Amino acid sequence: SLYRYLGGTHALKLPALLILAADGTAEETEMDFRELMLVPKGISSVQGQIRAAGEIDSLFREALKKRNGREGEPDRKKQDAADGGVLKLLEKAVEEAGYQCGKEIFFAVNAGAGRLYEKQSGVYRFPAESRRCGQRVERSREELIEYLTRLTGEYPISLLEDPLYREDREGIQELEKKLDSLNEDDILILAGSIPKSLPQDTYE
């Protein structure tokens, strides 16, 4: 079991929780990434992590309502359009709740790139961003790598899941090189939902 693999009662330190903050399939979120999660790994107790997540989530929901309620502000809508706009709202909610981004609270991003990828044309389409911008937004592999690299430089992202089409091993390697050049060696990149290095029965 996972509990046994992590050391059971003898574990020195348990992993931080990953707490869902934004679901890309929810209408109110209006983002293209599959999921954004809070990683409160700078808070020592599980109770403290859960409390922080609740406080942040409440402020984040209010910020989303305000963003989605804006009408007749095309420039502002473009500014808020990308998934980076949702990350900015989440970062602001963390700070307003009294926590420190990059010290107490980090983010995990499940880009879910496979659902954005159009195999025939070889580009990634961003429908939510396109709607908010009023024009089609699509990115090549190189453009998506640059986009993800920029986001990890601007926000305290500690995990990137499915950042590119899963069969694009060359692209994953290029992304890893980009992050290494930024000294972002603390970021874990998962090209699938379960790392292959873990024992097969870990998640049973």
Regions found by a protein language model. Give the residues of each.
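Structural signal for hydrophobic packing residues in well-ordered secondary-structure cores
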Residues: 1-2, 6, 10, 40, ...
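Buried hydrophobic positions in well-ordered alpha/beta secondary-structure cores of metabolic enzymes
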Residues: 1, 23-25, 110, 160
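Mobile "lid/hinge" segments at catalytic clefts and subdomain interfaces of large enzymes
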Residues: 5-76
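Catalytic core of soluble alpha/beta enzymes
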Residues: 73, 77-78, 84-204
